């Protein structure tokens, strides 16, 4: 092993250790449910839009056992770190997948049909669109079992068939779990159900860049495995999609823009639909620790707008029949939605007026997929004085922080996190006690 490889592996190991320390503390103080979860997280229907979803339709997140990767210290920004876990036995928790799916079926008119808010061309092609997911990976045997997965998929397929609906179902999973599924005896049982659900398999991917994906985000995913899963899905006639993150620590905002843009281009070349995930700031995560110490900042609203503009321009080049070109995760993020997002971030450069304009147009585009709204928004914010401040910030970042080698930046942040972690946890405990006293 070369010194560079050894340094890389050492950074991965140390980052995982920091993440585990934060998550163990969180699990120790988190609410432990005395029963299995009876219904999934599915957000609310606000201003004609399903919240906490990937688009103008509901997303059902059915937590069972915690995600293995969370417990192992992977996925540093983890959105689901604060999802309560159950105190019941493992087998009872596994069964909650079926219980929560039954809740969806019993309330189908209200939370599936009632949460449809498409305004684009696909509105007339699909009667219902929804996303179906666990905390981490639906095909993970640590989170669900073959028998509960089969039962849950069968229940959904039967309900849709009974109602004579044309579905589009987004299913979230980890690449390696999905590869295990493809080579297992479960495949012959589940695959026909996936076809009945008109499934799009959504992989956690985050970035096409190895350093960004596996060192900053800590995804622990090889490009070889990802491309293998995509190739198999293509041969099977199942559309693949992939999540792309846009809030990496240790990077300048120009670097984030370029990283996401290059990743969108890579996915599009493989005919994989990109799902843009804007960052929020979950407590007890490495990004939150670095943010509290002034060593990380959320992307500016103008950066978010530029990321989508680039995504839209690239994905328009390759049309996908009867599918979305792209999806955009909830701008405020959850569950549970954290207190801080890139719109209310106190360190953002964009003024409150431009921030509001950007937020409104991104919300509208999520629902309508009408990217022509971009030009209206860009015109409204182009002459504001914060535009010049934003450009100056990008230049300043690139000339100072951006001149350092990326590995050096990451190493400095991890070293700081190791030293600061105890103080951060003490700060969080003090903050939570103060909040309890105010109740």
Positions of PLM-derived features:
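Acidic (Asp/Glu)-rich catalytic clusters
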Residues: 115-125, 156-164, 185-198, 230-237, ...
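Conserved C-terminal portion of the radical SAM core fold
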Residues: 224-285, 303-331
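Active-site-proximal loop/turn and secondary-structure-junction residues that shape catalytic pockets
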Residues: 137-139, 173-177, 207-209, 246-250, ...
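Generic structural signal for well-ordered alpha-helices
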Residues: 98-115, 119, 149-158, 184-191, ...
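Canonical Radical SAM [4Fe-4S] cluster-binding loop centered on the CxxxCxxC motif
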Residues: 47-103
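Core AdoMet radical
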Residues: 81-104, 111-148, 159-181, 198-225, ...
């Amino acid at each position: 092993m070369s010194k560079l490889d050894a340094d890389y592996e050492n950074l991965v190991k140390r980052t995982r250790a920091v993440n585990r320390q934060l998550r163990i503390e969180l699990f120790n103080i988190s609410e432990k449910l005395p029963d299995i979860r009876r219904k999934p997280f599915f957000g609310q229907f606000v201003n004609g839009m399903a919240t906490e979803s990937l688009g103008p339709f509901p997303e059902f997140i059915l937590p069972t056992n915690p995600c293995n990767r969370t417990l192992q210290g992977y996925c540093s920004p983890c959105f689901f770190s604060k999802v309560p876990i159950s105190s019941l036995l493992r087998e009872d928790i596994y069964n909650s997948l079926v219980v929560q799916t039954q809740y969806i079926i019993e309330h189908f008119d209200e939370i599936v049909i009632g949460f449809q808010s498409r305004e684009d061309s696909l509105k007339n092609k699909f009667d219902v669109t929804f996303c179906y997911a666990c905390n981490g990976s639906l095909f993970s045997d640590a989170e669900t079992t073959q028998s509960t997965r089969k039962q849950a998929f069968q229940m959904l397929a039967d309900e849709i068939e009974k109602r004579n609906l044309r579905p589009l179902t987004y299913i979230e999973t980890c690449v390696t779990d999905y590869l295990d599924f493809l080579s297992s005896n479960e495949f012959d049982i589940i695959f026909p159900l996936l076809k009945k659900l008109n499934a799009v398999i959504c992989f956690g991917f985050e970035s096409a860049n190895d350093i960004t994906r596996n060192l900053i985000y800590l995804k622990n995913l090889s490009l070889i495995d990802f491309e293998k899963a995509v190739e198999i899905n293509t041969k099977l006639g199942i559309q693949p999609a992939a999540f792309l993150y846009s809030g990496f620590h240790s990077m300048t905002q120009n670097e984030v823009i370029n990283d996401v843009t290059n990743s969108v281009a890579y996915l599009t070349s493989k005919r994989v639909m990109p799902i843009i995930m804007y960052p929020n700031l979950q407590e007890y995560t490495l990004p939150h620790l670095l943010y509290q110490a002034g060593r990380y900042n959320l992307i500016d609203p103008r950066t978010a707008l530029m990321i989508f503009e680039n995504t839209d321009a690239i994905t328009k080049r390759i049309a996908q029949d009867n599918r979305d070109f792209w999806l955009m995760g909830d701008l405020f993020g959850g569950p549970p939605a954290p207190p801080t997002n890139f719109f209310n971030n106190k360190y953002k450069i964009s003024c409150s007026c431009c921030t509001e304009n950007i937020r409104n147009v991104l919300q509208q585009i999520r629902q309508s997929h009408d990217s022509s709204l971009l030009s209206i928004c860009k015109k409204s914010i182009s002459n504001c004085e914060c535009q010049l401040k934003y450009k100056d910030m990008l230049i300043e970042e690139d000339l100072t922080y951006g001149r350092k080698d990326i590995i050096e930046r990451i190493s400095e942040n991890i070293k700081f996190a190791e030293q600061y972690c105890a103080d951060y946890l003490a700060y969080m405990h003090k903050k939570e006690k103060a909040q309890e006293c105010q109740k």
